[in-house]
Amino acid sequence: ASRIPTVEAQFFGELATLLAWADEVARLEVMANADTPHDAARARAYGAMGIGLCRTERMFNDSRRLPIVQDMILADTPDERRAALEKLLPIQRADFKGIFQAMAGLPVTVRLLDPPMHEFLPTASQLEFEIGQLRNLQRAARSVAELPETLKLLDPELPRDYVESLGKLQASLALYRESRSADAALERREALLRKVHVLSEVNPMLGHRGVRLGLSFPEIYEMQIRAILEAAAECTKEGIVVHPEI
């Protein structure tokens, strides 16, 4: 089917004038949901009077940050968890600063981490599939290493070009095995799968989340509150009026 070219929606002068008239008599203030500085800037441009809900878990779902969040979840001790949180702190601080800058002078309501931990992990079925694939890869690498001797059972005088080709393949596989990249990937996925089983809940919507999560792992909320306050302090130093609400 054909597609009609689209353009980004824009506020034209006439609409801005109409909305300004509405603002003069409005008794309600409309705020926005925004979880990133980009979304906050768009909301401000569209006339939002602040951010009514900033969901911090949306910041964690970024593909560059998710591995750090997963390290935090896999941590067995508070110290290990804090090490991962220290990596997240500057990222969260930068996010909040960008949001406060976009919403200068307006309130920003921040919700600390709410969803259960397992939402940041792959599903059990996905992990089981990936573990199976990695184990197949390991078996295949071992089989190729044994291939020359196996082929000699069929033909003790292997053709020279067979021997050379297999030698090159074996050399490549030897480097791969020495790097242990597959072993590390397998170990991580097995650890994630164990954690998925541990965190599994019958009804996650009413389970280990929100304030319950904060009571179990107070260091998570400590990091987030620190990031909010440090971002607010940096903005204040730059003359930006901020109204963070947690």
Task: List each language-model region with its residue ranges.
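Conserved alpha/beta-domain cores
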Residues: E8-I246
